[in-house]
Design a protein with these regions (language model features):
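Rossmann-like NAD(P)-binding element
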Residues: 60-97
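Structural motif
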Residues: 12, 37, 73, 97-100
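Rossmann-fold NAD(P)-binding glycine/threonine-rich loop
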Residues: 99-109
């Protein structure tokens, strides 16, 4: 097995798209650790039970600590606010990507 590309991937939002990406990352061995933050405790419990994440958080700031990849899988309108919240806690080398359909507000933040 090859060395994973990422040490820690943090998903912010774990709906249909986020959970699908997490599943692929696990199947392909792309990360040593996958964590997520979402508002629903039930979603976090289900994701852990399914083996999609190792740890779940209600606070996105906790999820992004030490992450080298952050995947924003949020409604487009929530993206800018979440980015502003987590930005001070990201490492200099952290890659941030999103799955939203518009990019202007993401680039601005």
């Amino acid at each position: 097995m090859s060395v994973p590309l990422f040490e820690k991937v943090a998903f912010i939002g774990l709906g249909l798209i986020g959970s699908s990406l997490a599943r692929v990352m696990i199947a392909e061995g792309l990360a040593k650790q996958i964590v997520a933050s979402t508002r629903s405790e039930r979603t976090l419990q289900d994701a852990k039970a399914l083996g999609l994440i190792q740890q779940g958080y209600s606070d996105p700031v906790e999820a992004v600590q030490g992450a080298d990849l952050v995947v924003l899988a949020l409604p487009v309108r929530a993206t800018q606010k979440v980015l502003e919240t987590i930005k001070p806690y990201l490492q200099e080398h952290t890659i941030i990507t999103d799955v939203g359909s518009t990019k202007g507000n993401v680039v601005d933040a």
